[in-house]
Amino acid sequence: MTSLLEIKDLTAFYGPLRAIKDVSLSIQEGSVTALIGPSGCGKSTLLRTLNRMHELSPGAKVKGQVLLDGRDLYQLDPVYVRQEVGMIFQRPNPFPTMSIRENVLAGIKLNRKRIHRIQQNELMERCLRSVNLWDEVHNRLGRPGGELSGGQQQRLCIARAIAVSPRVILMDEPCSALDPVSTKAIEQLICKLKEKHTIVIVTHNMQQASRVSDWTAVFNVARSGGSGELVEHDKTEVIFTSPKNEVTLNYISGKFG
């Protein structure tokens, strides 16, 4: 298995505030990597640096490198980067006034890709089937995406993301606003999606991390008001059964966080 994303000595700032410090991490192609750790340790900040969303925040900047297949993301067109590296947010965010069909195809139209309507319909159906949503919505594709349940909306957002064929999908707490049944559906979907995509997921749910991920990276803040730092990165089974770092052991055993 080869590294698709390489994070090298990455430090991220919000104005004068240093959110994460000197993070180096390899993301394996075709795998699910979970980022875990207590609140405020920089997990979501790191995730946002991986498709250049971090720089959209006022005063935000990064030092270090993020390489996609050896190419520095910060030397590439950000529009291209976000085609290659999609993002799923904590709360489902379908475009509320767009139909289900329009939501799936939104990225295609945003990127001005011209494809025939027949091809559009084939792509839409393929993406909705990929997220196990087609059977639930095929007879109401013209209805607004905002009418769907929370779990359905999140799957619609994933269908929208994969429509542009990203190599990497970032997920920031994708199940935190969902009920247990919808959470199970998303977790099953994550395991299916890694056949075609590399996935990086931020989660506070350690059981979820152990269920869906192949690799786990543990983050922590060394002191109050300090920067988030990478503590340990290893195969998920190792992290949860025989961690090498005492901080990791204390976190997964519930002694803090």
From Swiss-Prot:
Localization terms from the record: Cell membrane
Alphabetic keyword roster: ATP-binding, Cell membrane, Membrane, Nucleotide-binding, Phosphate transport, Translocase, Transport
Gene Ontology terms: cellular component: plasma membrane
Main location: membrane
Recorded topology in the membrane: Peripheral membrane protein
GO biological process terms held by the UniProt record: phosphate ion transmembrane transport
Domain annotation ABC transporter: ranges: 5-246
CDD domains: ABC_PstB_phosphate_transporter (cd03260)
InterPro entries: AAA+_ATPase, ABC_transporter-like_ATP-bd, ABC_transporter-like_CS, P-loop_NTPase, PstB-like
Complexes and interactors: The complex is composed of two ATP-binding proteins (PstB), two transmembrane proteins (PstC and PstA) and a solute-binding protein (PstS).
Function: Part of the ABC transporter complex PstSACB involved in phosphate import. Responsible for energy coupling to the transport system.
Family, similarity comment: Belongs to the ABC transporter superfamily. Phosphate importer (TC 3.A.1.7) family.
The name this protein goes by in its record: Phosphate import ATP-binding protein PstB
Originating organism: Tropheryma whipplei (strain Twist)
